[in-house]
Amino acid sequence: ANIELSLVVDTTAPVVKNIASSGQIVRGGSAVVAVQAKDMALDNVYISNGTDNFKLFSYLNNDIYVGIIAWPLKNKFFSAQVVAKDKAGNITKYNLPIARNINAPYYRSNIAIKEDFLNGKLNELLAQINQKHLKPFENNVERFVFFNETIRQEDESRILKACSDLNSNISFAEDFHAFMPLKGSKVVGNFGDYRTYFLNKEKISEAVHLGIDVASVKNAPIIASNKGVVLLKSHLGLYGNTLLLYHGFGVSSIYSHMQESYVQVSDEVSVGQELGKTGQTG
């Protein structure tokens, strides 16, 4: 028997066009991207910084995609490239003209660790960590390095996983506001601060601060600046009681060192809603 089939052989790659994007990006910062991607059988479209891939979200119609691309401090290199692939396997790679600014001013801090901290507060913090982590330490320096480096990395991995596990295309960002979680607060610690720790004038550890420390008064209310959904509620070793909120288009916010929180994972929050309270130090 003879079988006749009509087939469409697709050898045409998707067409990608830049609609709008941030003019430049600083190392440690982010940029907004909007592109048009057209194809009769488009399968996937995303943006890469040369190391990491970021999701692009359908906006207004099926041809327009928007999203946020980051240049993490850990990455020395940055190159913005949109990748579009159709169901036939045709791929288009489109480079975006985002200028790189490597001159962002990040602080360097030298922090003296005191024996009182190693014998007091550090013991309290280590006691809150899952017992499977704990092992015999030769001295206080080993204990501090374990907490400052190993536990820090595990915390950051948990936060990244919570963000990456999100499958929802829901956007809450119709009217996006600057983040101001504490009224009447002031910044006491900067993002990207490179911290070197010393004990008796000897360097024992180092770390990059990946948050912004804002201080107010004891047990101050922590307010949601934007609508969102709770992705993570957990006690993390270095971050303490922590909430992670997702706001749409790949943007999340994290709140750490909380005394208490009033929301649960999957809860939707509204602008102005009280998320919880700060701790003893504000």
Which ranges hold each PLM region?
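Long, compositionally biased, intrinsically disordered segments
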Residues: 1-4, 27
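Proline/serine/threonine-rich low-complexity linkers at boundaries of modular beta-sandwich domains
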Residues: 3-15
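Proline-enriched interdomain boundary motifs that mark the N-terminal boundary
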Residues: 13-19, 222
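Short beta-strand segments of immunoglobulin-like
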Residues: 19-26
